[in-house]
């Protein structure tokens, strides 16, 4: 399903049953399906209207109804919300989520919108130039991205990727940012392979929401970075800090007052760390 209406002069009743008529389904079955689906989608009072008389959300529901009456085993949604305004996209996203839960039918949903993918998907395949980068649950996509492309694609702002190298001392491993001597311990990290890590060039990944202005856990790692920029977006602010000439973004409540140009004490939740090989850009 992509476009929310067919020809503009076709009444919605005819629009919804078009596929059944083409398949030469009996009139009785057509009326039965039309009544059941239109009530389910709450568009039964709209069937005698033309597309120009309906709202964007109503047109989208009728388009879904046109597919539903045929009782498919799999739905393909090809960017169905791309032509809707922001408010209506949110409303229709909820509608599609409810529909999926009620029908318990397989849905293949194509979108460039990460919010749609994360909120609707039970399994997400992220593609780049036609190649699947990661096929996983939304939770694993967010918490354990398979490479820097996925890490950068998911999240707003996306994951901080700080370039540096690892230092291995016996069973202890540290991250040192390029141009810095400061060591960040990452002993709890789940490495795929823990051999030959010393001097390995990597990207240290940590999401902005896992950096805190106030300590949230005793295990949080304390850092002091210079605050360079503040972006106020209502209930929260996005702060940019300097870490060895690399930008680090963090999300804080807008009520927190942070002075720009000053050194600020921050706390990193290192349990949320991701590490990527600097050459292959794959998770290690």
Q: Which ranges hold each PLM region?
A:
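Non-catalytic connector elements of ABC transporters
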Residues: 157-159, 168-284
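Positively charged, low-complexity/disordered segments
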Residues: 1-7
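Short, conserved clusters of charged catalytic residues that mark active-site
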Residues: 2, 91, 145, 222-223
């Amino acid at each position: 399903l992509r476009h929310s209406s067919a020809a503009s002069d076709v009444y919605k009743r005819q629009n919804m049953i078009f596929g059944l008529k083409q398949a030469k389904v009996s009139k009785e079955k057509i009326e039965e399906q039309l009544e059941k689906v239109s009530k389910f989608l709450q568009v039964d009072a709209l069937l005698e209207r033309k597309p120009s008389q309906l709202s964007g959300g109503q047109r989208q529901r009728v388009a879904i109804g046109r597919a539903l009456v045929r009782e498919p085993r799999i739905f393909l949604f090809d960017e169905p919300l791309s032509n809707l305004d922001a408010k209506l996209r949110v409303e229709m996203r909820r509608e599609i989520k409810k529909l999926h839960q009620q029908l318990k039918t397989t849905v293949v949903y194509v979108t460039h919108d990460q919010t749609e993918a994360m909120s609707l998907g039970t399994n997400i395949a992220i593609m780049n130039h036609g190649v699947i980068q990661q096929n996983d649950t939304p939770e694993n996509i967010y918490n354990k991205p398979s490479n820097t492309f996925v890490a950068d694609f998911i999240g707003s702002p996306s994951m901080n990727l700080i370039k540096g190298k690892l230092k291995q001392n016996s069973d202890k491993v540290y991250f040192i940012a390029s141009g810095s001597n400061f060591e960040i311990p990452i002993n709890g990290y789940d490495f795929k392979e823990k051999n030959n890590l010393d001097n390995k060039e990597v990207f240290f990944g940590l999401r902005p929401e896992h950096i805190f202005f106030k300590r949230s856990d005793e295990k949080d790692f304390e850092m002091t970075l210079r605050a360079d920029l503040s972006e106020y977006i209502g209930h929260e602010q996005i702060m940019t800090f300097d870490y060895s000439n690399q930008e680090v973004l963090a999300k804080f409540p807008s009520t927190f007052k942070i002075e720009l140009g000053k050194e600020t004490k921050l706390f990193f939740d290192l349990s949320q760390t991701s590490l990527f090989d600097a050459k292959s850009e794959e998770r290690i």
